[in-house]
Amino acid sequence: KVVGRVAAIINRRANETWNKKEVRFGWIDFVDDPEVSKALLDQVEAWGKERGMEAMVGPLGFTDLDAEGMLVEGFDQLSTMSTIYNYPYYSQHMERLGFEKEADWVEFKLTVPDKLPEKFVRISEIILQKYKLKIKKLKRSEIKEKNYGQKIFDLINEAYAPLYGYSKMTQGQINQYIKTYLPLIDLRMVSLAADEAGELVAVGISMPSLSEALQKAKGKMLPFGWYHLLKALFFKKPKV
């Protein structure tokens, strides 16, 4: 019987960027047994030491688009599909093993009114005029024809650079993410901001929440899981 799993990762670009010698652990799951969690992380530590690493950090993935962090509160809240879920005992195991929190990831829930408050509209107009910005919607044809797929990920690389543990995505990774994610996004929920020269300076992407649909599907596409997902994506007023 499988009682735990973990991945050991050395992100050399991140280590070079942040001048670290760290081995990452990610995709960690274990039963509520201190011996199991210790055995998993002992293996990661040993593997990292063999390769010259001096510290262990996690949960982290290969890039910032992989799942990161560990849930420590809000267990009673319905999270987004991309949020890590783990049982409360996970963080207790980490603390017993000597791990300390190094960064916070915080998820917010905002209630969007049917009509935007006039104050928001007024401030938005002032900012657009002051910095000479233009807001546009992305068209499917522009992803390739005007290279907006590449521009969006170049912007993410630049904007995310100061974030904890970030390492810039390679061109190969960018190509894969463009192929994987952009066809799934409802472009009506994507907004772009460009400066006076037409250069992309900001992007905002919203997606319908699939959490309730995944619960109804019980995590499976068949026999009828696909129906709940399609309904959430295209036929139901979205919760974003």
Language-model segments: which ranges?
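Short alpha-helix boundary/capping motifs
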Residues: 77, 122-123, 180-184
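Acyl-donor binding region in acyl/amide transferases
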Residues: 17-103, 217-240
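A conserved beta-strand-loop-helix scaffold within acyl/acetyltransferase catalytic domains
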Residues: 1-17, 137-240
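Acyltransferase donor/substrate-recognition loop-hinge adjacent to the catalytic core
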Residues: 84-165, 189, 202
